[in-house]
Amino acid sequence: MALCLVGSEMCIRDSLEGAQGALLDIDHGTYPYVTSSNSISGGSLTGLGIGAKEIDKVMGVFKAFTTRVGEGPFPTEIFGENAEKIREIAGEFGATTGRPRRIGWFDAVAAKYSTKINGLDSIVITKLDILDHFEKIKVCTAYEYKGEKLDFFPTDPEILSNIKPIYEEFEGWDESTYNLDSYEKINEIAKLFISKLENILDVPIDVISTGPSRNATIIRNKLI
């Protein structure tokens, strides 16, 4: 996540950036497959001694697909050709170990849970261009557990390990989004994908990344 903080005395804009994903949070993540600290936005406040009233905006960063490092439940995990393609094109390997990251389609249920526990005001979607390479794209919009539909994220790893994702499928787009710097330049199918995520998460997607360079960034709305 990223916390945007405006200093009231000197009017200096500062930002705080978390190092780990929300679902690794020791209290609100998929325990015991978590880290040893609070990785949600609130952890930044206690860690740095900042009052909640000083925070101007909380932004959450999501990839256009889902990844996980190490063990733990992963409802939308995929294998085979599609997983390998995403991993290779997106460079999804551990920064220090080089270990391949686990790959899955976008899990909107988990993402919506993350928006709640972090109190997100705004969302950044990265690596949209990676999805240029697929004829079909899936988004998990709910789960099925023991014949029942779940529209919430259960943090119990026993339940998570036995649920099935319910997908909404999108046609892939045959136009490249790589390095685009304007939302108007994105094709209509990719826009539909972004709009769907925005509607499900009920948080505005203000920034979209379409490549590794700084210039490959689309800013849709004023951030601060």
Task: Tell what function each PLM region has.
Residues 14-17, 24-25, 60, 125, ...:
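General beta-strand structural signal in soluble alpha/beta enzymes
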Residues 30-34, 48, 99-104, 183-187:
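Hydrophobic alpha-helical scaffolding
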Residues 1-7, 11-12:
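Single conserved hydrophobic/aromatic residue that forms the stacking wall/gate
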Residues 138, 148-224:
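Internal helix-turn-beta structural module
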Residues 25-29, 34-36, 69-74, 135-139, ...:
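Short acidic, glycine/serine/threonine-rich loops at helix termini
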Residues 21-22, 28-29, 44-47:
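Active-site loop-to-helix "anion-binding N-cap" substructures in soluble metabolic enzymes
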Residues 34, 38, 42, 48-52:
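Conserved catalytic-core segment of NTP-binding enzymes
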Residues 47-169, 177:
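A glycine- and small/hydrophobic-rich beta-loop-beta segment
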